[in-house]
């Protein structure tokens, strides 16, 4: 059966409804058959406050002054801003959010900004929001903010939707599986499959890897294992042992097959495979010996030996 199915099955107990729905939405069709219309800007560095103020110039001072004397922002106000095509930056300033930094999603008025952006961009609100945020925050900073926001009830849904847009942008930019694994702060859990599965970022990451491989389960398994090996002290045996010890048996079996296919693709000798799975000293019929036996058969078939 397909790897992604087992991944989602394993994650179902720990991924909340919105996350599961978001992961489902981010399947292959979202990346391959739908156009990327987020129009995300190339600049991704967290910009220097002074240079931003210099670019905005006098309008910034005026908007700041309006903030000091304005009454409470109402839905009618947001509607007027949207009708007048006010910029996302204008709304952030008027809502006194432009200096919120990494705490933007925790601010009470952030919901007003989301409402304004939805009114202004009813067809692609999340894409427009992400585009605006990416002019203010670098990839790693914004990713960390979204991960934190997904854990808070009030911002979980919007953060999940924004993360979908972020993944689409990364796909367009050509970020690798390792890049996203790192941005999702998963590398510290690469020594335990069970810890990875329990992390809410694992499901979106695997979905991203699946999209990178155009839905091919074999290539997906191989890429997942390659990334795990990179962050598992770069030891193949460490990954094999980790998978063998996992409670997520079907997922572990799929990934061990990915490890098998990686070694076969790289023409690793059977005695090296035997050492990496720890077959020596195990009884006949052990999982390790059966693994090596299957590998020898596949290797000989590949090379017509």
Curated annotation (Swiss-Prot):
The keyword Secreted is annotated on this UniProt entry: yes
Induction description: Expression is induced during host plant infection.
Record GO cellular component, one term: host cell nucleolus
Motif (RxLR-dEER): 44-56
Chief subcellular location: secreted
Keyword Membrane on entry: no
Localisation per UniProt entry: Secreted; Host nucleus; Host nucleus, Host nucleolus
Keywords of this entry: Host nucleus, Secreted, Signal, Virulence
Span of the signal peptide: 1-16
Domain of life the protein comes from: Eukaryota
Function: Effector that enhances P.infestans colonization of Nicotiana benthamiana leaves.
Annotated family: Belongs to the RxLR effector family.
Domain observations: The RxLR-dEER motif acts to carry the protein into the host cell cytoplasm through binding to cell surface phosphatidylinositol-3-phosphate.
Protein name, per record: RxLR effector protein PexRD25
Species classification: Eukaryota, Sar, Stramenopiles, Oomycota, Peronosporales
């Amino acid at each position: 059966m397909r790897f992604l199915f087992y991944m989602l099955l394993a994650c179902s107990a720990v991924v909340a409804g919105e996350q599961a729905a978001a992961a489902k939405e981010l399947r292959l069709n979202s990346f391959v058959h739908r156009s990327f219309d987020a129009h995300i800007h190339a600049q991704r560095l967290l910009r220097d406050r002074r240079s931003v103020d210099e670019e905005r110039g006098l309008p910034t001072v005026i908007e700041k002054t309006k903030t000091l004397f304005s009454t409470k922002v109402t839905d009618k106000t947001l509607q007027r801003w949207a009708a007048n095509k006010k910029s996302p930056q204008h709304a952030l300033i008027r809502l006194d959010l432009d200096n919120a930094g990494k705490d933007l999603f925790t601010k009470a008025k952030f919901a007003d900004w989301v409402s304004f952006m939805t009114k202004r961009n009813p067809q692609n609100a999340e894409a427009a929001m992400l585009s605006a945020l990416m002019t203010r925050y670098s990839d790693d900073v914004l990713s960390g903010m979204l991960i934190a926001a997904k854990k808070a009830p009030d911002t979980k849904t919007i953060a999940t939707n924004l993360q979908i847009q972020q993944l689409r942008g990364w796909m367009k930019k050509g970020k690798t599986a390792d890049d996203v694994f790192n941005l999702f702060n998963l590398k510290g859990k690469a020594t335990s499959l069970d810890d990875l599965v329990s992390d809410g970022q694992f499901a979106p990451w695997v979905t991203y890897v699946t999209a990178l491989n155009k839905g091919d389960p074999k290539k997906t398994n191989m890429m997942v294992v390659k990334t795990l090996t990179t962050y598992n002290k770069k030891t193949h045996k460490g990954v094999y042992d980790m998978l063998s010890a996992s409670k997520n048996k079907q997922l572990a079996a799929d990934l061990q097959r990915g490890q098998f296919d990686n070694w076969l693709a790289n023409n690793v000798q059977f005695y090296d495979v035997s050492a990496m799975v720890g077959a020596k000293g195990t009884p006949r019929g052990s999982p390790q010996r059966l693994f090596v036996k299957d590998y020898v058969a596949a290797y000989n078939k590949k090379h017509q030996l």
